[in-house]
Amino acid sequence: MTSVLQIALLALIAVSFALVVGVPVVFATPNGWSENKGIVFSGLSLWLVLVFAVGIFNSFVI
């Protein structure tokens, strides 16, 4: 179970980094928001699922 937690945490860190870099780039480009709105919302949804998954997996490890 520890390895599942570590993989989920690594995925959370990677998605967080991608969103921190990607969202300002999307807002800075002309027509970026209207063209990439779905990608941003998909990333945010994945981030939210990973936050809950890490919390649930953490309760099993400790």
UniProtKB/Swiss-Prot annotation:
SUPFAM superfamilies: PsbZ-like (SSF161055). One of its GO terms (biological process) is photosystem II stabilization. GO terms for cellular component: chloroplast thylakoid membrane; photosystem II reaction center. The keyword Iron does not apply. The chain crosses the membrane at residues 8-28, 41-61. Signal peptide: none annotated. It is a multi-pass membrane protein. It is found in: Plastid, Chloroplast thylakoid membrane. It comes from the Eukaryota. Disulfide bonds: none annotated. Keywords: Chloroplast, Membrane, Photosynthesis, Photosystem II, Plastid, Reaction center, Thylakoid, Transmembrane, Transmembrane helix. PSII is composed of 1 copy each of membrane proteins PsbA, PsbB, PsbC, PsbD, PsbE, PsbF, PsbH, PsbI, PsbJ, PsbK, PsbL, PsbM, PsbT, PsbY, PsbZ, Psb30/Ycf12, at least 3 peripheral proteins of the oxygen-evolving complex and a large number of cofactors. It forms dimeric complexes. NCBIfam families: PS_II_psbZ. May control the interaction of photosystem II (PSII) cores with the light-harvesting antenna, regulates electron flow through the 2 photosystem reaction centers. PSII is a light-driven water plastoquinone oxidoreductase, using light energy to abstract electrons from H(2)O, generating a proton gradient subsequently used for ATP formation. Belongs to the PsbZ family. This is Photosystem II reaction center protein Z.
